[in-house]
Regions:
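Hydrophobic alpha-helical segments with strong N-terminal bias
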Residues: 21, 38-40, 69
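Short amphipathic alpha-helical segments
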Residues: 5, 9, 33, 41-44, ...
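Active-site-adjacent loop/helix segments that line or gate small-molecule/cofactor pockets in enzymes
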Residues: 1-31, 86
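Glycine-rich loop-to-alpha-helix module at the N-terminal edge of alpha/beta enzyme cores
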Residues: 42-100
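Active-site and channel-lining beta-strand-loop segments
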Residues: 25-47
Length: 100
C-alpha cells in the first residue's frame, strides 16, 4: 500500500521544484464530489478541478461521451488539425450567448 508520506518522498526525488503542490495528499480515486487518497481517507473535493466543477468526478454522461470520443479520436490541436465536434460545440455556445 502506498502512503502519502512515501509518495511525497518519491515526488521530492522525481518532480521539478517549480511544480507546486498545496496538500501532501495523493488522490487514488474520486466519484461525484468525493476524493479518496492513497491511504483510503475520504475528502470532499473543494478544489473543483478542471472538468469536474460542474458535474463531479465520473459523471456517467461525461464518462460515456469520453468513451465514445476515444473510439474516434483521442486528441488533436484544433488549430493544427480541425475536427467537427469542436465546431458543433462552438455553434451550440454561440446560440446560447448573446452578441455577434
Amino acid at each position: 500500500m502506498n502512503s502519502n508520506k512515501a509518495m511525497m518522498a518519491r515526488r521530492s526525488d522525481a518532480v521539478p521544484r517549480g511544480v507546486g503542490q498545496i496538500h501532501p495528499i495523493f488522490a487514488e480515486r474520486a466519484e461525484n464530489c468525493r476524493v479518496w487518497d492513497v491511504e483510503g481517507r475520504e475528502y470532499l473535493d473543494f478544489a473543483g478541478g478542471i472538468a469536474v466543477l460542474n458535474t463531479g468526478h465520473l459523471h456517467p454522461q461525461v464518462v460515456a461521451a469520453v468513451e465514445d470520443q476515444l473510439k474516434k479520436l483521442s486528441h488533436t490541436c484544433f488549430q493544427v488539425l480541425a475536427y467537427e465536434p469542436y465546431l458543433a460545440l462552438c455553434e451550440k455556445m454561440n446560440q446560447k450567448v448573446p452578441g455577434d
